[in-house]
Amino acid sequence: MSIKKKTEMNKSIKGSKTEKHLLMAFAGESQARSRYTFFASVAKKEGYEQIAGVFMETAEQEKEHAKRFFSFLEGGMLEITASFPAGIIGSTAENLRAAAAGENEEWTDLYPAFAETAEEEGFKEIAAVFRQIAKVEAEHERRYLALLAHVEDGSVFERTEEIAWQCRNCGYVITSKKAPKLCPACAHPQAYFEPMKTNY
């Protein structure tokens, strides 16, 4: 596979700054994936099934980002110097805030800088991948901040206007300002309700 990569890029990344940036990005995405699975467990315990689901979905997306970055590496050992979050597992609100901050750093600072270096070193495909993944990280931050706002203002299960709420367990839908305490169809608790997705 590395021979194919060299052919596509017309040169090896070995010894380049881009090689180090790819490994740093791979490590960062891999760690984010693990953190998000830890955060999902906390959200579930606190009664936020939707937020737990978002953390797990994002963890899988981070795995795919890590896989993409890893696919450009050409093997061997590589020493890097980098800083990574050594945070704690907090409450759901604290975890959402920490996750949003990490996503923000990736899309506003790290990946644009990595893309610029890759471009300067002649790795246009890698530069494009850094830029495209940065767009995803911006969406991750937006989603985490929206969920955080609902946790902080107590609107995870109650809104000012009527909306469609859907049970994540059985699919039951009810239109109301507030999600029911128990699902009338499957008797799962309110924790399983989320605003119904309508953008299919």
Curated annotation (Swiss-Prot):
Fe(3+) 3 binds at C167, C170, C183, C186. The keyword Oxidoreductase does not apply. Binds 3 Fe(3+) ions per subunit. Residues 12-155 form the Ferritin-like diiron domain. It is found in: Cytoplasm. Its cofactor is Fe(3+). Gene3D superfamilies: 1.20.1260.10, 2.20.28.10. Residues 162-200 form the Rubredoxin-like domain. It holds the Pfam family Rubrerythrin. Fe(3+) 2 binds at E62, E103, E137, H140. GO terms for biological process: response to oxidative stress. Fe(3+) 1 binds at E29, E62, E106, E137. GO terms for molecular function: iron ion binding; oxidoreductase activity. GO terms for cellular component: cytoplasm. The keyword Signal does not apply. Keywords: Cytoplasm, Electron transport, Iron, Metal-binding, Transport. Its main location: cytoplasm. Induction: By exposure to dioxygen and hydrogen peroxide. InterPro entries: Ferritin-like, Ferritin-like_diiron, Ferritin-like_SF, Rr_diiron-bd_dom, Rubredoxin-like_dom, Rubrerythrin, RUBY_RBDX. Homodimer. Possesses two rubredoxin-like centers and two non-sulfur oxo-bridged di-iron centers per dimer. May provide oxidative stress protection via catalytic reduction of intracellular hydrogen peroxide. PANTHER family: RUBRERYTHRIN-RELATED. This is Rubrerythrin. The gene is rbr.
